[in-house]
Amino acid sequence: MTSLSPFPAATHPVFPVPAHPVLRVPPAPPAEAAAHFRAMLAFHADVSDVAAALAADGDPGFVLLDSRSTEAWEQGHVPGAVHLPTALVAEQAEQLLDRSVPVVTYCWGPGCNGATRAALALAELGFQVKEMLGGFEYWVREGFAYDTWQGPEQRPADPLTAPVGADDCGC
């Protein structure tokens, strides 16, 4: 009988096939899981972590890049972010960014892949890059201040995305 597991039989313990889908494919062996999750953290940054780094005294060690259109930027953006629309990365990144400083990209939110496309373009140009999970949507929903063409704004934290009255989720 052929196994449907993505792992060779010798790398995971005997695991009965459950009736529900959660464990129908067994969890990865710990070393493989650690490598996978470490790699995920090499590609992504959390909104709360970015906010904490930007709020701390001194240089956060990265540049935050808003990859949306000018209209979107004016509607609202993270304070201190650099504006470089995805379509202009190849043409303007060299003039706006320092290759020795990591870049964290963001776009509208989880339903938009503009930050992913900008991150790809930057990586292809030789920049170290991560993507901010949740984008501008989650920045606003977590209650962080943002700038608009009319000035600064801030909304209360959405209790479905961030603890109300706390600086971070404690993750």
Please state what every model-predicted region is.
Residues 1-63, 69-75, 149-171:
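Flexible, polar/low-complexity N-terminal or interdomain linker segments that lie immediately upstream
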Residues 50, 66, 81, 122:
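Terminal peptide-recognition signature
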Residues 58-64, 79-80, 102, 128:
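Short active-site oxyanion
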Residues 73-79, 139:
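Short loop/helix-cap segments at secondary-structure boundaries that form the rim of catalytic
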Residues 77, 93, 143:
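Short, flexible helix/strand-to-coil boundary loops that buttress conserved ligand/catalytic motifs
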Residues 82, 100, 146-150:
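Short, hinge-like loop/turn segments at secondary-structure boundaries
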Residues 84-91:
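Glycine-rich, highly charged phosphate/nucleotide-binding loops
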Residues 93-140:
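Catalytic cysteine-centered active loop of the rhodanese-like fold, especially the PTP/DSP P-loop
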